[in-house]
Each structure stands twice: as C-alpha cells, then as structure tokens.
Amino acid sequence: MAVTPISLTPGVLAEALVDLGAIEHNVRLLCEQARGAQVMAVVKADGYGHGAVQTARAALAAGAAELGVATVDEALALRAAGISAPVLAWLHPPGIDFRPALLAGVQIGLSSQRQLDELLTAVRDTGRTATVTVKVDTGLNRNGVPPAQYPSMLTALRRAVAEQAIVPRGLMSHMVYADQPANPVNDVQAQRFTDMLAQAREQGVRFEVAHLSNSSATMSRPDLAFDMVRPGIAVYGLSPVPELGDMGLVPAMTVKCTVALVKSIRAGESVSYGHTWTAQRDTNLALLPVGYADGIFRSLGGRLQVSINGRRRPGVGRICMDQFVVDLGPGRPDVAEGDEAILFGPGSNGEPTAQDWADLLGTIHYEVVTSPRGRITRTYREAHTVES
C-alpha cells in the first residue's frame, strides 16, 4: 500500500488533510469483511471530523450501500449536497419536525412511541409514507426501544403499516463494547436482537434488514453481520480494536501546520506561561501557530511530539490558545520558518498518530479526530493516492 508524501496546501496556516483514497480503501476492506452483508457507512458528526459530504461520496464510490447519521439535519445536509443514496437518521429530541426529512426521502430511526407519533403527524401533513428503522435497546441503555415497551411499539407499527403510513425498513441496535469483540455481552446482545427480530415477525411486522455490527464486529465478528453492518470509526482508518493493530485500515486524517518562527534561547531560560519548562542547555525552538482553540488539547503541553523534516520533536511548555513551542535541540537548527510540522497522521513516515494522542490523553482516538477546529482548515486529497 503506497501513500504519497504529505505537503502543506499553499496559503493555509494549518490544515486537517483528509485522504479520500484512504476512505475508499477502508470501505472496500469493510465490504470484504462484511462477507455479503451490505455496508452502511456512518458519517455522523460531520464524518467523524473528516467532512460528511466528501467522506460519504468516497464511501459510496467504494461500495457502501447506505449512509447513517445521528440527526435529521445531518441527513438533510447530505441531500442538499446532491447525495441521493439511502440515508438513515436516528437521534430525535421532542418536537422535531420530520416533514423536511420525509420530503427529502430520509429514512427515520425510531426509539420510542413518542417519536412514532410525531413522525405520523408529519406523514399526515406531507402525504408522504415514512420509511422507518426501529432501534431497540439490547443492553446499552441509551437510545432505543426498551424490551418492556417493544410489544406496544410493534402494535403501533403494525397499525401504521396497515394505514400505509410507514414502511418498516429495518431493525437495529447498538453494541455496548465497541472495542472488545470477544466480550460475552456481545453475544447476549446478539441473542436479544435475534429474539426481538423474531418477536416482530410473530406480531406481523416484517423488517427488510437487520443490523447490529459496529466497526469492531464488522472486522472481527462475521457471525454478527445479519443483513447489514454499520461501521463508523473504521471508515476513517482508525482501528476499532487498537490492541489488534491497524487491521489493514489506513488513517485518513493528517493534521499539520507551518513553522511560524524559529529562535534560540540560552540554558536556564524558560518557555510559555508559568515557565513550566526550562532549557537545560542552549537550544533552538520552533513556534507552531495552533493551540487549544484549534483543538490542540492543552493537557498535551510538554507531552506531545511533532514531526518536522522527518524527525519527532518534543513539545515544551504550556499549549496556549493559538500557539505552542517545540524544542529543536542545540546547534545549528535543521528547521526553518515555513517548514511543515505534522501533529498527527497515519504514522507511515514516523509521525505521531491519533492513537498516540489518545494514549497520552487517556481517551479514544474518536475524540482526537473530531477535535480539529478553529483555524485548522479541512482539505482533501483525491481518491487515487492509496492502493490496496
């Protein structure tokens, strides 16, 4: 697998470069792992920080059959961009207006009787039949119809089908252990899901597709594929089970900036607010023009590393709102103002990765890639740079 060298876009101070070729590679791999089941690529939260429209197009080009988002507004943004593929939205607060979704052909995920009632109001107002997926709670105790309320939900669905108000497209649930494919709770959830699918059939509600698998299960539990899988983080090349390595996935995002300033300081001089770092010898510093307002976590001060000219350099001192400092070491500096600094990327050239940041922060790489903002401009490399 070949990845072309990274270079900063001219005129851009800092950027999150998204390699659409990596997205396509990852989705092709997920399609292979799905073993005949369809793939719904999840592009919620603006494509996990990668850009929902661009990543959706890349995922569809690579073989994804459908798209998944959290909110109706996210689905409508895809429609506004000209994406006509099936889109499912499943997170709805009280009082939501489902009419624009119905008019745009967006599929609606339902987790309660209240949501169904509000949807049926929109059906009457628009004259459009709603295509629905019922989300059931199999143990996460978050979004989804609880088992105790499921029988009455099925009764209401059956009545709505008889009135030609809805088409029952799918049954879905969400897994508790996103990064532990062997956890026995996964099997408990799968059995509950299977039972609820059978219960629907017994009550005369027949769903066209059922889907439970997240990224982890798609990559490692083919027995949980049902009719469709619903990967999220793996679409973007981040391993759903970091302990198992990259699993053949290629991280799509690289965050980088220009070196704004290079300067020398003497031994004993200190850096940034609070002087938390003091030079032990004469050294050179590079100033990078991004900070915590741009998604560079303040808690990484004095802990992160940055790759400049093929070498990792330690960050020193506190990270500020819009800048931080790295130590280039003594002697004649081998870094010049205007050089490229890579904060994290795929790691193929030795640069830090999103997983490295997650490990330092005690969090997950999902949080890292959804954090770049502010003055970090999102840019794209077209889908011809990664080869399977």
UniProtKB/Swiss-Prot annotation:
Residues that hold substrate according to the record: R142, M321
Tagged with keyword Acetylation: no
GO process annotations (BP): D-alanine biosynthetic process; peptidoglycan biosynthetic process
Cross-referenced Pfam families: Ala_racemase_C, Ala_racemase_N
Active site: K44 (proton acceptor), Y273 (proton acceptor)
PROSITE patterns for this protein: ALANINE_RACEMASE
A Gene Ontology cellular-component term: cytosol
SS bonds (residue pairs): none
Pathway membership, UniProt: Amino-acid biosynthesis; D-alanine biosynthesis; D-alanine from L-alanine: step 1/1
Cofactor(s) this protein cannot do without: pyridoxal 5'-phosphate
PTM annotation (N6-(pyridoxal phosphate)lysine): residues: K44
Record-listed E.C. numbers: 5.1.1.1
Signal peptide (from-to): none
Keyword terms of this UniProt record: Isomerase, Pyridoxal phosphate
GO molecular function, one term: pyridoxal phosphate binding
Keyword Cell cycle: no
SUPFAM superfamilies: Alanine racemase C-terminal domain-like (SSF50621), PLP-binding barrel (SSF51419)
Superkingdom classification of source: Bacteria
Catalytic activity: L-alanine = D-alanine
Function: Catalyzes the interconversion of L-alanine and D-alanine. May also act on other amino acids.
Family under the similarity heading: Belongs to the alanine racemase family.
Record protein name field: Alanine racemase
